[in-house]
């Protein structure tokens, strides 16, 4: 498949893509939302957002612009980058930016929401990076509900910001890095104006596709056979 379409309550589009080094787009900030109100496992009301997962940014962009007319006005956007990315070589491609403190040291959704609200009172776009998602353990909130050991197992999945983006009606793109189960998360305020800058930033953060996995899966699709020549 070239494209996956799914719903995201608390990270169900963002994190499958991130854990598999795929690209994703969450459209909660541009009204790609369900009208049904639900409650999360930690008692937060939300309606599910709609998003896309793809192997490349071009396919993702085509899907988004097919559904959403780009209404972006020519204006300047204030971009914040978490300061743990100051030495990141890809971040150097973004010239107009401000580094801010990465104080997301809790997995608590309310705490994350409060901190993001403070950031988006001043900035339009935030760039973060989350790593080793669902690699050491599986971060499912149902699993984490069975005592302290299962809660720690859930926490070891390293999920943070992606758990609240839909609940806050934000728009986001994930761009995989060259490390396993790791991606940049580019997050924007609610509004159609941010579609273009989100994709422009995403294009600046792209790594070359892993050639071995590309050859493996392309050969499988073309020949219906997982055996290929190295």
PLM-predicted stretches and their roles:
Residues 4, 96-99, 170-174:
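Conserved beta-strand scaffold positions in the cores of enzyme catalytic domains, especially
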Residues 14-20, 37, 91-93, 138-141, ...:
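Short acidic, glycine/serine/threonine-rich loops at helix termini
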Residues 1-64:
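Short glycine/serine-rich loop segments
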Residues 36-43, 66-74, 172-179:
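Short, flexible, solvent-exposed loop/turn segments with mixed acidic/basic and small polar residues
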Residues 61, 117-230:
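Glycine-rich, small-residue loops and helix-cap segments
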Residues 65-138:
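Gly/Ser-rich, acidic/histidine-flanked active-site/gating loops
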Residues 6-9, 27-29, 55-57, 82-84, ...:
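Fold-independent oxyanion-binding glycine-rich loops
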């Amino acid at each position: 498949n070239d494209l996956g379409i799914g719903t995201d309550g608390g990270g169900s589009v963002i994190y499958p893509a991130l854990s598999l080094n795929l690209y994703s787009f969450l459209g909660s900030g541009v009204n790609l939302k369900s009208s049904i109100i639900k409650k999360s496992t930690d008692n937060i009301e939300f309606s599910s957002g709609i998003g896309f997962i793809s192997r490349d940014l071009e396919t993702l962009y085509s899907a988004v612009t097919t559904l959403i007319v780009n209404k972006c006005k020519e204006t300047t956007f204030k971009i914040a980058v978490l300061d743990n990315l100051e030495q990141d070589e890809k971040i150097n491609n973004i010239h107009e930016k401000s580094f801010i403190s990465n104080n997301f040291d809790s997995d608590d959704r309310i705490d994350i929401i409060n901190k993001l609200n403070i950031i988006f009172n001043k900035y339009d776009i935030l760039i973060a990076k989350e790593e080793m998602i669902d690699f050491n353990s599986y971060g499912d909130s149902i699993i984490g509900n069975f005592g302290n050991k299962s809660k720690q197992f859930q926490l070891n999945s390293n999920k943070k910001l992606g758990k609240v983006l839909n609940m806050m009606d934000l728009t986001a793109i994930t761009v995989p890095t060259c490390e396993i189960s790791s991606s940049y998360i580019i997050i924007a305020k609610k509004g159609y104006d941010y579609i273009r800058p989100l994709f422009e930033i995403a294009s600046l953060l792209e790594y070359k596709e892993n050639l071995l996995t590309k050859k493996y899966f392309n050969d499988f699709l073309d020949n219906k056979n997982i055996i290929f020549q190295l």
